[in-house]
UniProtKB/Swiss-Prot annotation:
This is Assimilatory nitrite reductase [NAD(P)H] small subunit. Pfam families: Rieske. It is found in: Cytoplasm. GO terms for cellular component: cytoplasm. It catalyses: NH4(+) + 3 NADP(+) + 2 H2O = nitrite + 3 NADPH + 5 H(+); NH4(+) + 3 NAD(+) + 2 H2O = nitrite + 3 NADH + 5 H(+). It comes from Bacillus subtilis (strain 168). Its EC number is 1.7.1.4. The gene is nasE. Residues 8-104 form the Rieske domain.
């Protein structure tokens, strides 16, 4: 159950999210990259690579990671941490599936 102090926003239906591909979603002043992984889970992260600002929704997904399309930085979709030898992080967002809809919770 979602706490009354948080916001829950519908970002679409599950079937609208292509598996292993990113989708750009705008919520208020935030630009997010949303991914449906091969296991059916949904992940949402900040849509800019911390290195040079690459659009992560355009990156290649492998397992629990997205690779920045600009310089191939490997970023965890679980915690937003850039994998070594590079370093940095992006903000991650909680997602929630209710029925056929996907929600961003923040």
């Amino acid at each position: 159950m979602v706490n009354k102090d948080v916001t829950k926003v519908c970002i679409g239906k599950i079937e609208e999210l292509p598996e292993q591909l990113g989708k750009t979603v705008y919520i208020e002043d935030k630009e997010l990259a949303v991914f449906k992984l091969s296991d059916g889970s949904i992940r949402a992260i900040e849509n800019r690579c911390p290195h040079k600002g690459g659009v992560l929704a355009e990156g290649i997904v492998s397992g629990q990671y997205v690779f920045c399309p600009m310089h191939d930085w490997k970023i965890s979709l679980e915690d937003g941490i850039v994998q070594e030898p590079d370093h940095g992080c992006v903000k991650t967002y909680e997602t929630l599936i209710e029925g056929e809809h996907v929600y961003l919770v923040y």
